[in-house]
């Protein structure tokens, strides 16, 4: 007998994001959708939006933006390797994320980081500089 979750053609957007392991809980997924961090086929949507295979979903996670195409629809949360079979990330998205990570890596290399905390005299000099 086929599993009803596997034969489903439509699933709520928040449930699909949870099942595909973009978010740990459905409530986190719902909050991100309502906050405009998730776009379905180029438009903001609601958590109850029905997800269908072939749809394009844009998800912001931290500093990265991922654009994925839905390959399969599932209501059940599965292991990470099986969850990755539910979608594929677009080439443009992969390229953009790689460029952004390189830029962040180079920025952190050139950012000055002090070797130690400033002592009392150096703190007073910093305060004087900041006041002017």
Swiss-Prot record:
One of its GO terms (biological process) is cellular response to heat. Residues 11-73 form the S4 RNA-binding domain. Pfam families: S4. One of its GO terms (molecular function) is DNA binding. Keywords: DNA-binding, RNA-binding. SMART domains: S4. Residues 94-132 are annotated as: Disordered. Residues 94-105, 114-125 have a biased composition (Basic and acidic residues). Belongs to the HSP15 family. NCBIfam families: PRK10348.1. May play an important role in binding of nucleic acid. More specific for RNA. This is Heat shock protein 15 homolog. It comes from Aeromonas salmonicida. The gene is hslR.
């Amino acid at each position: 007998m086929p599993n009803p979750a596997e034969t489903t053609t439509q699933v709520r957007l928040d449930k699909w994001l949870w099942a595909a392991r973009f978010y740990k809980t459905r409530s986190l997924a719902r909050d991100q959708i309502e906050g405009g961090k998730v776009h379905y086929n180029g438009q903001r949507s609601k958590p109850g939006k029905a997800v269908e295979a072939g749809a394009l979903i844009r998800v912001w996670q931290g500093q990265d933006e991922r654009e994925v195409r839905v390959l399969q629809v599932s209501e059940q949360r599965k292991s990470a390797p099986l969850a990755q079979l539910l979608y594929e990330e677009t080439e443009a998205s992969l390229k953009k994320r790689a460029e952004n990570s390189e830029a962040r890596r180079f920025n952190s290399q050139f950012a000055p980081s002090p070797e130690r905390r400033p002592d009392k005299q150096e703190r007073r000099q910093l305060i004087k500089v900041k006041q002017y």
